[in-house]
């Protein structure tokens, strides 16, 4: 059996070669000729999988190691009898840590305190729920907006008083910060294409901090630029871009943090994407999933951090700890440097930065040894995912 896997799927060769002859190809470059004799296709979001790619091939199963599916033509799969899977939640913690790092970066750079700020989380699924938890750990007030879930349930699972969903108008009127974690939905009552449009920003609280680590087309780029120019929006974090990999340089030049769709690219997040697809392929084939990723996992890059707390604000200490584990500013710098190439090179560099992304480990693999520090600081670090001594 022939299998093709896209690059940027850690341990794909190790996992899928236990099932058949496996090749690794650059995701955006996979063509119909590459998959004509292939039965299993495992990939990420850079590969558009549709009739043009698959018609006339032997492909029986498509698995994407991502939480999104807008790159898959599912209606064609159903028509052609092709089974498929995705990896919901595989990188949810990674994205929530990216948002945490961004919040601390902005707060320390611009001199404001996160505690007491109101953050609106639009989309409270696998990612959004973790963002809510970490925002609360930082002492923020959280407004949750998720119309599909609100129709199904009036409260979150624990039925706590702080776990009610609110409508978008309330989020826009009250939130100091808004972060978006929705799927890309092109039509219907829950359409998210250009969710953040001119009306969205006009209704927002003046000086809004806006963050998008969902999908690029969720944001109307001209509307965002106008909101920045008019002072409606003060600071922006963008990890996803309209038209990516051919993103707009004028948008990049105006945002505080610009990264090339890597919020979910922690090593653990990518590995779990591979694992989830591998297990679904095994289920499809009716064979036991005997391969395990555990023996292949490398030691953490930053196993321990020792921090002197005396005389420093908790937020400054938190920023230092997070920065040592995840160099967000480095991601921003590399992306901006890559944009200096000519247009064709700039577009290629977007994919290159993603496929050759440096190893980033999640907070849970780092122990923080605090010299001093309050019980509150220790609790926050634990709630963010760190081990604390």
Name what the model sees in each region.
Residues 35-40, 56-60, 173-178, 205-208:
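Short acidic/histidine-rich motifs immediately flanking catalytic phosphotransfer sites
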Residues 10, 137-157:
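NAD(P)-binding Rossmann-fold cofactor-contacting core
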Residues 207-388:
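Rossmann-like dinucleotide-binding domain for NAD(H)/NADP(H)
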Residues 7, 88, 96, 115-136:
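Glycine-rich adenosine-cofactor-binding loop
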Residues 96-112, 137-140, 275-284:
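Oxidoreductase and adenylate-handling cofactor-binding alpha/beta cores
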Residues 49-50, 150-249:
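Rossmann-like adenosine-cofactor binding region
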Residues 1-38:
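N-terminal glycine-/charge-rich "phosphate-binding" loop or analogous flexible N-terminal tail
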Residues 39-112:
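Phosphate/diphosphate ligand-binding glycine-rich loop within oxidoreductases
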């Amino acid at each position: 059996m022939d299998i093709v896997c896209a690059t940027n799927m850690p341990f794909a060769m190790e996992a899928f070669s236990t099932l058949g002859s496996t090749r690794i190809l650059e995701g955006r470059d996979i063509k119909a000729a590459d998959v004509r004799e292939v039965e299993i296709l495992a990939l990420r979001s850079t590969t558009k999988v549709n009739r043009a790619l698959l018609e006339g091939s032997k492909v029986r199963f498509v698995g994407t190691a991502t939480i999104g599916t807008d790159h898959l033509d599912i209606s064609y799969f159903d028509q052609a009898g092709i089974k498929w899977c995705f990896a919901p939640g595989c990188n949810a913690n990674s994205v929530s840590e990216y948002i945490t790092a961004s919040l601390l970066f902005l707060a320390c750079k611009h001199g404001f305190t996160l505690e007491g700020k109101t953050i609106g989380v639009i989309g409270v699924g696998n990612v959004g729920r973790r963002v809510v938890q970490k925002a609360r750990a930082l002492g923020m007030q959280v407004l949750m907006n998720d119309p599909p879930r609100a129709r199904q349930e009036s409260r979150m699972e624990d039925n706590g008083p702080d776990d009610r969903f609110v409508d978008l108008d309330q989020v826009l009127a009250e939130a100091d910060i808004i972060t978006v974690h929705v799927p890309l939905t092109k039509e219907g009552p829950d359409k998210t294409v250009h969710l953040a449009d001119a009306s969205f920003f006009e209704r927002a609280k003046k000086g809004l901090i806006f963050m998008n680590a969902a999908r690029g087309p969720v944001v109307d780029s001209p509307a965002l630029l106008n909101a920045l120019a008019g002072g409606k929006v003060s600071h922006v974090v963008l990890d996803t871009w309209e038209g990516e990999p051919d993103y707009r340089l004028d948008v990049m030049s105006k945002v505080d943090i610009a990264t090339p769709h890597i919020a979910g690219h922690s090593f653990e997040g990518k590995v779990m994407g591979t694992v989830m697809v591998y297990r679904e392929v095994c289920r499809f084939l009716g064979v036991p999933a005997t391969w395990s990723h555990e023996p292949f996992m490398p030691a953490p890059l930053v196993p321990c951090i020792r921090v002197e707390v005396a005389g420093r604000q908790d937020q400054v200490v938190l920023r230092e700890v997070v920065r040592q584990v995840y160099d967000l500013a480095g991601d921003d710098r590399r992306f901006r440097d890559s944009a200096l190439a000519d247009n064709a090179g700039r577009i290629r560099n977007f994919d290159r930065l993603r496929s050759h992304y440096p190893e980033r480990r999640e907070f849970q693999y780092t122990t923080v040894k605090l010299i001093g520090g309050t019980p509150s600081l220790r609790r926050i670090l634990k709630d963010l995912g760190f081990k604390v001594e």
